[in-house]
Every structure is written in C-alpha cells, then in structure tokens.
C-alpha cells in the first residue's frame, strides 16, 4: 500500500504496520489509522506518528525514557483490557514533541503518553491524572545529557 504524505512524499507500508487508535488522538478524534515512521538504524530518538486518514497530519514522537529514564505511570486493568495487552513488555510508549523555531524551547507532552500494544497494533493516548508530569516539559537539556552519557 502507499500513502502520499505532506512531509515524506510517497511512503509504502503494509497493512500489518497500521496502528489503530479506536478513539483517535485527543483533538484529532476522527483520525484512527497511523504509521510509526523512523529508521531503527539511525541514532535518532525521534519518530513520526503519521496519520493514514489525513496524510497532512503527522506528530513528532519520542520514547520519553530516552531523556527521562525515570518516566513511569501505572497501566491499570482497564487500559490493559482496552489494548488487549497480554504482556506489558510489548507496550511501546511515546510522547508528542513540539519543536518550535527556537530549538531550545522544544517540549514534550509527558502528561499525555501514547501507548501502543506492539502485539496487535492497537494504540491510545491517555491523559495522566496526576501533577507529576507537564504538558510542556522542556527536553533539550535532558536529551543532551542523555546522549553525552551514552
């Protein structure tokens, strides 16, 4: 299958690569089908969550544990059932990154992680019910530190 995207031109993908968000993404509830775009071989922590339903929409995402190793939250039974999770080790965790003109002001939304069950490609974005994490968490310095210690 192929998709003509705004950011990447034509990309080829297989049906089994499609991640299904039953509820969409908050603010984009009408979008349900996405791809993760990013080269595993490259030493780049960022990936793209590319909408198939609207090829003009793509979100920059990152595994928050790359820059914040202590990032954790509870995955309750309701969430496990919703994603049909058999093994929590198969869950992928991403957060949406905003990269403004001034790169120093780059932030990640730690308050609303994206969780994907890699076993069945079901995904959801949840909003954490605590004050531990910010919607606009500055990440540039933490990324620099993570890569200087790698």
From Swiss-Prot:
It is found in: Cytoplasm. Keywords: Bacterial flagellum biogenesis, Chaperone, Cytoplasm, Translation regulation. Disulfide bonds: none annotated. Pfam families: FliW. One of its GO terms (cellular component) is cytoplasm. Coiled coil: none annotated. The keyword Chaperone applies. The keyword Secreted does not apply. GO terms for biological process: bacterial-type flagellum assembly; regulation of translation. Its main location: cytoplasm. NCBIfam families: PRK13285.1-1. Interacts with translational regulator CsrA and flagellin(s). HAMAP family: FliW (MF_01185). Acts as an anti-CsrA protein, binds CsrA and prevents it from repressing translation of its target genes, one of which is flagellin. Binds to flagellin and participates in the assembly of the flagellum. Belongs to the FliW family. This is Flagellar assembly factor FliW. It comes from Caldanaerobacter subterraneus subsp. tengcongensis (strain DSM 15242 / JCM 11007 / NBRC 100824 / MB4).
């Amino acid at each position: 299958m192929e998709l003509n995207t705004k950011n990447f031109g034509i990309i080829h993908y297989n049906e089994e690569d499609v991640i299904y968000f039953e509820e969409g993404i908050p603010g984009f509830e009408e979008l349900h089908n996405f791809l993760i775009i990013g080269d595993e071989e490259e030493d780049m922590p960022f990936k793209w969550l590319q909408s198939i339903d609207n090829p003009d929409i793509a979100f920059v995402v990152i595994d928050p544990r790359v820059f914040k190793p202590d990032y954790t939250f509870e995955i309750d039974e309701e969430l496990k059932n919703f994603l049909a999770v058999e093994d929590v080790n198969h869950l992928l965790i991403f957060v949406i990154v905003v990269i403004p003109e001034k790169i120093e002001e780059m932030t990640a939304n730690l308050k609303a992680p994206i969780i994907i069950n890699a076993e069945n490609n079901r995904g959801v974005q949840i909003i954490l019910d605590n004050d531990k994490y910010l919607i606009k968490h500055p990440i540039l310095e933490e990324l620099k530190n993570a890569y200087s210690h790698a």
